[in-house]
């Protein structure tokens, strides 16, 4: 089956499972050696349908959190839209993809995800932060909550209603509580007292702005955003290594 994947984490997952991916977004950068010769048809928010049609795909793969509704509505070929908003929904969607593609490796990943869901939740350790890259300022006290930051100007965080939030909670972190329905709330850092900040390396490249962050005087760390936000094979490998020590 010829697949155009508009979801970076699914692109990597499908390729590693042996599915034939014939088109991708410019953000589909993994696995590096496998994506080199796969044509780019757009980004996660916009696409050239002419380029897609030229590739003669059997299916376009979308995700409700990654791609806009218009992309599904305008898609000129059959499509499948997943909806990954938590570890639980990831397990469900992996099983669905495994069945759709009749692919045992995808089914095996869904079982791995189930193992992760059933694993005990550890105590969050601020001295051993998973996917740690660099200190903005090391914690000088105990913190009861963390805020995972994804954007600057405006400052944006994530709630527990997201896949990232689900991952953090599984790792034992207590997230800042936001109003229900606000998945990616705009926040004011100076108003967030007694909060330790995790600055993601993507989509905003906080690791390249470490000097500016240090000037704020807040305590926090830079973490690898791919580990926390790329669901599928990359996220599962990260959680297996962290939670199951496999």
Where on the chain are the PLM-derived regions?
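N-terminal ligand-binding lobe of clamshell/alpha-beta domains
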Residues: 1-246
């Amino acid at each position: 089956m010829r697949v155009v994947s508009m979801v970076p984490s699914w692109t990597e997952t499908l390729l590693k499972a042996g599915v034939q991916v014939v088109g991708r977004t410019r953000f589909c950068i993994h696995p590096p050696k496998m994506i080199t010769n796969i044509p780019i048809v757009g980004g996660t928010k916009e696409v050239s349908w002419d380029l897609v049609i030229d590739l003669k795909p059997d299916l376009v793969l979308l995700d409700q959190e990654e791609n806009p509704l218009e992309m599904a509505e305008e898609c000129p070929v059959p499509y499948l839209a997943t909806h990954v908003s938590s570890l639980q929904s990831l397990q469900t969607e992996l099983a669905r993809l495994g069945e759709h593609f009749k692919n045992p490796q995808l089914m095996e990943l869904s079982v791995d995800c189930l193992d992760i869901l059933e694993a005990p939740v550890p105590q969050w350790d601020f001295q051993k932060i998973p996917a740690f890259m660099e200190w903005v300022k090391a914690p000088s006290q105990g913190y009861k909550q963390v805020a995972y930051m994804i954007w600057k100007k405006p400052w944006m965080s994530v709630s527990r209603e997201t896949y990232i939030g689900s991952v953090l909670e599984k790792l034992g972190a207590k997230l800042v509580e936001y109003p229900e329905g606000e998945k990616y709330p705009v926040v004011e850092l100076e108003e967030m007292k007694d909060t330790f900040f995790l600055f993601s390396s993507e989509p905003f490249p906080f690791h390249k702005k470490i000097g500016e962050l240090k000037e704020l005087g807040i305590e926090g760390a830079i973490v690898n955003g791919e580990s926390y936000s790329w669901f599928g094979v990359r996220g599962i490998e990260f959680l297996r290594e962290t939670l199951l020590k496999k």
